[in-house]
Regions:
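Structural alpha/beta core scaffold segments of enzyme domains
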Residues: 1-225
Length: 225
């Protein structure tokens, strides 16, 4: 579009690609357009490369999120309802922000059964770099939101966060007819039929000597506070 040429009239040669394809999917567009305009104007091949300082200033990074939540829970730490609001700093262009923000929403439950949940996502256009794909692609941001809520509940009730996590874990179900254990479902309606979060957590607590180490830490803190 920048050159007024048809797609089949443009030839692009790339020496090597390497990895991290998500971040390269659209972040090179600005350079590509500049090269195309220069090549058409001079009728010569054109090659451009950012130096490292310009690269860091211009190219997008991981999407930073602000996640607000309101959560209701009982005295055991069981989540009765939760409402998330995601505020996503996308930058000056859309890039891959929509699927990144979507995936954060889809990971908002992490390993927990949220029976009554609302998730709202606000994708913010800002005067900063256009953020892009990064390892996890929005998943870690969504997970951090619910984990922060779990820690908040545990602190409020003076419970071990492990207890709050365990009581809220998905339990395994089955899709077989006649089985009384109906699968729980994710906020987007997917049946959970193979969750082993409780079992693996119990194994880890035993093999890590969690309780004895926790008591030792409490005793040390008491004696040295």
């Amino acid at each position: 579009e920048a050159t007024g040429l048809k797609m089949h009239e443009v030839r692009v040669e790339v020496r090597r690609m390497g990895g991290a394809f998500g971040g390269k999917e659209s972040q090179g567009n600005a350079l590509a357009i500049a090269c195309a305009i220069a090549a058409k104007a001079t009728k010569k091949t054109c090659k451009m490369r950012y130096d490292r300082d310009d690269d860091i200033i211009i190219t997008g990074k991981r999407h930073d999120f602000r996640i607000d939540y309101d959560v209701g829970f009982n005295e055991d730490g069981k989540i009765l309802g939760i409402k998330f609001k995601h505020y996503v700093r996308c930058g000056w262009s859309q890039d891959l922000s929509l699927p990144v923000a979507d995936r954060a929403m889809l990971h908002s439950d992490n390993a927990y059964n949220l029976e009554d949940v609302s998730i709202t996502s606000h994708r913010l256009k800002t005067n900063t770099q256009s953020n892009t794909a990064f390892r996890g692609f929005g998943g870690p941001q969504g997970i951090i939101g619910i984990e922060r809520a779990i820690e908040h509940i545990a602190s409020h009730l003076n419970l071990d966060p492990i207890e709050v996590r365990t009581i809220n874990f998905y339990r395994s179900g089955t899709l077989l007819k006649g089985n009384l254990q109906k699968p729980q479902t994710t906020p987007y309606g997917m049946p959970v039929v193979d969750s082993i979060s409780t079992e693996i957590t119990e194994t880890l607590l035993k093999t890590a000597n969690y309780k004895s180490r926790l008591e030792a830490i409490k005793a040390w803190n008491k004696d040295n506070s």
